[in-house]
Amino acid sequence: MVHQIHVIGGGLAGSEAAWQLAQAGIRVRLSEMRGIEATPAHQTDSLAELVCSNSFRSDDPTNAVGLLHAEMRALGSLIMAKADAHRVPAGSALAVDREGYAEAVTHAVAGHPLIELVRERVDALPADGPVIVATGPLTAAALADSIGAATGADALAFFDAIAPIVHHHSIDMDVAWMASRWDKGETKDYINCPMDKDQYLAFHQALLDGEKTAFKEWEKDTPYFDGCMPIEVMAERGVDTMRYGPMKPVGLDNPRTGRWPYAVVQLRQDNALGTLWNMVGFQTKLKHAEQVRLFRTIPGLGKAEFARLGGLHRNTFIQSPKLLDGALRLKSRPNIRFAGQITGCEGYVESAAIGLLAGRFAAAELLGRPIETPPAATALGALLGHITGGAEADGYQPMNVNFGLFPPLEGAKGGRKRKGDRKAMMAERAGEALKAWMDGGVEPA
């Protein structure tokens, strides 16, 4: 079969992209190296294998990921169809029989008359022709080098140091304040949470005592990225190490005392909307429950709601907000699209969702139809917007879908609405926006 497009990678994103293309009448070559070469993490040769958890997280449509589920179902997602067909009891979450689900995806993709599944390792980006790269966080070294050469990245495999991200509306600004160090610049760019000496010493000890997550076997030989150091490792190096690093208080006058605090935790705006703020320098291997407990002891963050918790793990992804256009094309080589975790989205569902969009966009392009991106008010549109420009390009890190990526509700600020009401209103708005988009768009044949 002479293919019209080459999809590299048979994970969730690549399988979904190939399916969307084939359903639109496009002939696809899908390359997957498992079957001839194993990865350190996968256990089978099945497409769309779930490497870690068997959970697709909440299926509640008033939760951001549950809303993403609903939107993907509406657009004919293969991954969601097979997940639903192999669902196992998990309360309000969508969990699956991982083997049955992956086998079903493999059977559907391999059996599609317009998809040629080829077990092969691709060592370089194809020179021409439409391509979707969906090789995930364990991209083979040779292909990672080729991607690095095409994108200007020096290295793509490293430990990404993920700092926690906090919803702005949950920060207590009666305790914290906005300022830049020494009041430099015309704007006050940081939210500052002050600590006195006793608070700092207690926080330092809690970091030392906190329960950490162990590295996986296949992560142990991967270097840190740019020498990033977990906050608890800084704590281990001395009681004052953090005060001379990310918790340095100099140049930050607390307007309530007129003095510098003993230490300070700074948060920096993380998205263009200003709804998400990251904890500067707080990459960590603390377990998630420990992070929530410990970081809520920081003055001003007592009721913090986290859009993402910190982490440190091996990953391979590109600087998508800088490199990709709004249709997931590489700006320097627009015949190449990226999809899935290699774009910097985090999670099974998010990876499949970006694969779905990449497949639909590529199909529209090949069929000579206009590319219609989903509205920003939808989960698909919010996630796409974050990846392709909504996030800050410098320091870009993987992110799960969350309501902080959506445009704020009009009227009263989100923090003045009850959390459940705000989510329900955003979900309702998203449903209306998706319907209008689908009614006005051209569906695959």
Swiss-Prot record:
Enzyme class: transferase
First-listed, main subcellular location of the protein, grouped into a coarse class: cytoplasm
One GO cellular component term: cytosol
Recorded superkingdom: Bacteria
Coiled coil (residue ranges): none
SUPFAM superfamilies reported for this sequence: FAD/NAD(P)-binding domain
Record carries keyword Iron: no
Subcellular location field: Cytoplasm
EC number of the protein: 2.1.1.74
Catalysis: reaction(s): uridine(54) in tRNA + (6R)-5,10-methylene-5,6,7,8-tetrahydrofolate + NADH + H(+) = 5-methyluridine(54) in tRNA + (6S)-5,6,7,8-tetrahydrofolate + NAD(+); uridine(54) in tRNA + (6R)-5,10-methylene-5,6,7,8-tetrahydrofolate + NADPH + H(+) = 5-methyluridine(54) in tRNA + (6S)-5,6,7,8-tetrahydrofolate + NADP(+)
Cofactor(s) the protein needs: FAD
Record-linked Gene3D superfamilies: FAD/NAD(P)-binding domain (3.50.50.60)
Keywords: Cytoplasm, FAD, Flavoprotein, Methyltransferase, NAD, NADP, Transferase, tRNA processing
Record GO terms (molecular function): flavin adenine dinucleotide binding; tRNA (uracil(54)-C5)-methyltransferase activity, 5,10-methylenetetrahydrofolate-dependent
Pfam families cross-referenced by the UniProt entry: GIDA (PF01134)
Biological process according to GO: tRNA methylation; tRNA wobble uridine modification
Entry binding sites for FAD: 9-14
Functional note: Catalyzes the folate-dependent formation of 5-methyl-uridine at position 54 (M-5-U54) in all tRNAs.
Family that this chain belongs to: Belongs to the MnmG family. TrmFO subfamily.
Protein known as: Methylenetetrahydrofolate--tRNA-(uracil-5-)-methyltransferase TrmFO
Organism: Rhizorhabdus wittichii (strain DSM 6014 / CCUG 31198 / JCM 15750 / NBRC 105917 / EY 4224 / RW1) (Sphingomonas wittichii)
